[in-house]
């Protein structure tokens, strides 16, 4: 199609993409709209076998009446939608939104993929949002359907446009929001398969960044009604956008976006992580939560997304901060998905007097015939960490590990999450959180208790106490003969370089075996203590679980030692 002419207030319409001219050909892309606030045309549909849909035309740019440096008139035009694919064909990509100083245009949606049959097809990718004071939204990914033997894959959501001083656009890798909001992520496309192939939900867009970050988009769902080796997987979701307030005189709130939910499918998609939130100011801070895992209709549930971190760098900050909560693991027909870890909380200023508490871990999803999901441990006090989270407080307030998530239910009980760790570089106490208890098995063995979070005071002049978390109790065994109780979690390690006390967590109790010849779980090991100039108090090992009829009691856990 021809390019539309420029105009003072509205550009000409972009030409429509033509039909494909040969077998296996492709529809031509729609041409760009002229300068102004007009939309690009949509691509034409593929009309023959294996004909792909044409791409949507790009939206026109906002016209500058007084020259390139003058005020612009109108927002950028919207991108055209991608055309639908013909039989076996792929959907066309959505056109990008036009750029304009007042606001970028919205990206077009991806076209729907044709029946994939034996060759496979995909939905088109959503168009990216245009750049402007406020970024344009990214388009949604196209859907795809299959009745044959090949795969059907939903298209990815489009990226959000950059907001130079205002709002970031919706979509993956959204633009910076300046002083405004980041846009939400574009959703992934849905995939449906009635044949023997796979169905893959499309990936979602990420949220845009801003003082208020945009939420990640939801992953595309996948539905598989066929037979054979068909295993549909829900699309993973987008992460939440970051949020930053770099002005120490500001009282604004920094709110990062939440992660999107994983798509449902034969296997559930994973949830997106919450966005990171940072402030030099004295206003509030709200870290985004992790997205939940998708449901697995015949397989496993998706993993919950991690909570976003919260970082404060102003001693006058008075609102008690906390990292974002981890997302819930998705339920599964076989295994439940693991819960997401809680976000960290970090206080950088030595003048601060408030506590830093890590975010809570998400609960594990429920399983059917398989194992329940493992609960995600919260990250404590400030920094990042694997398993149990790391927390950092450089002020006089306490560093506290985040609460862990519970294990999911299942034939075999889910393991409890590990307690969040805590680090104090200032003069405050450090307290690791207790590990979560393992979940009882409905028919099988009980889940293992989570380990207690470690605690560290790392200031040689400090008299503060480091307290390791208590290990979680093991879950009881289920109804089937020989289903043993779960083991107790280990007590958290405690260490101080100052003259205070290092008090260590005790090991968790082993779960009971309730069925015939079932053995009780082993008690958790008591934590070790390290305090060269202070007072070390090692943890006591956990008691072993009680046996079922004809079984044996579980052994007690070993006591901790001074190291």
Model-based region annotation:
Residues 1-563:
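Collagen triple-helix signature
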